[in-house]
């Protein structure tokens, strides 16, 4: 009786129920993809077990095993027109919603099913093949293993979820670590050794992780976490790495005491995602935004996204205008307002632990993005190229051919935009001279409407600067 309502809204795992924009679809529901089809498959398998329904068990196993694959791209030239199939790719990327890198959000939900479903159907006629297990291992090692820093999930891989109050990079990182702990003893010997070292290092860097594992359902996970921490034979380390994610238009440069990340977009991937009233000013999150993770582990966790100027994200070169915040659909929530560029030259290359990334950018909007006022326009005459050369202790950022012909609006490049300490008294040094800058206040609405006082301080002949960090070894 209690499962009838669930069965009514989801008679099979291949479709989703009539909620939000889905209510406009034929037959009242839409085809499920990626993490959503895994969630639906988990429901189907659970329904099958509770109702003793072999058809639900079969469909849940079939739908999910057909999704736990390594997605391939037969013709990359078609990505601009067709977008991506949702799921993991050979470079460790996870794509969802056609054009959005989502390893640190939907990718986590995807992998929760990768833990849950095998535990329900293992040892039954509907259990997975060995190939599915190999793919799940690949996601763990090449996806999660290269997308975190000291237990924090990289914000560049979280899509619109960065705008959520409860969606911190620490929270997402802990969810990923729980998944890894549940799977770690089923990995191959080499993968297990790598992930044991990685997990021990991450848990040591996030000492609150083990205590965060509350509830009866986490007893075994907490026990395994403590065993790893107390095992002296496991060396806690994460090797230096330069990782290019070409399918996501992302780069990760991980050294011993810092991680640098670049977030780009192209004709294949979006500038951001504005959806369900979330992330409505995320316009430039993938416009060459750069991240520096160091010993200040609260830098992007402690209210960074709801206080940073959305028009001056670090690393970006933009025309500072309000582009639009989406259009309400039948649900009443704003959707859209995000877009692709018309540029294909976006990507990178790797030599050992060094790497290069490049992005040709423009203000032209390739797809017909919409907001409440109609078709979106940004800065159609803006164009340029950005490059990042990443070495052991040095990052070189270059720009060339940057122009916005015929338009009076300025083009601004933001080198860095750091969260200061609670008193705002971080020491700022220019050419060896300590500078005391005035503290100003503004809200996001004022920034977007250009009514805030954003006048700065000019420095003539500045050759080098240093900003005191929040904690030791966190200066920039």
List the model feature ranges, each with a label.
Residues 1-164:
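Aromatic-lined, polymer-binding surfaces characteristic
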Residues 110, 117-132, 136-476:
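Extended polysaccharide-engagement surfaces of secreted carbohydrate-active enzymes
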